[in-house]
Amino acid sequence: MAECDDRPNLVERAVMKLGEPKNQARLLQVAWRISLLMMVIGFIIIIKTISPNFM
């Protein structure tokens, strides 16, 4: 049978690492940049749909 040890597994370590403020700030920056990029792409799609000769 497998022994029970108190070392955290990979998932637990990842969750603890993501809980650190520095990593949360980095995740927020990445999420913000992705959302900004999606918004810009959306505007381009809307403009291209309304006026196909724009770009």
From Swiss-Prot:
Source organism phylogeny: Archaea, Methanobacteriati, Methanobacteriota, Stenosarchaea group, Methanomicrobia
The encoding gene: atpG
Membrane topology of the entry: Peripheral membrane protein
pH effects: Optimum pH is 5.2 for ATP hydrolysis.
Protein's UniProt name: A-type ATP synthase subunit G
GO cellular component: plasma membrane
Organism of this sequence: Methanosarcina mazei (strain ATCC BAA-159 / DSM 3647 / Goe1 / Go1 / JCM 11833 / OCM 88) (Methanosarcina frisia)
Misc: This organism has both a Na(+)-translocating F1F0 ATP synthase and this H(+)-translocating A1A0 ATP synthase.
Disulfide partners: none
Major site of localization recorded for this protein: membrane
Signal peptide: none
Known partners and oligomeric status: Has multiple subunits, A(3), B(3), C, D, E, F, G, I and K(x); there may be a few other subunits as well.
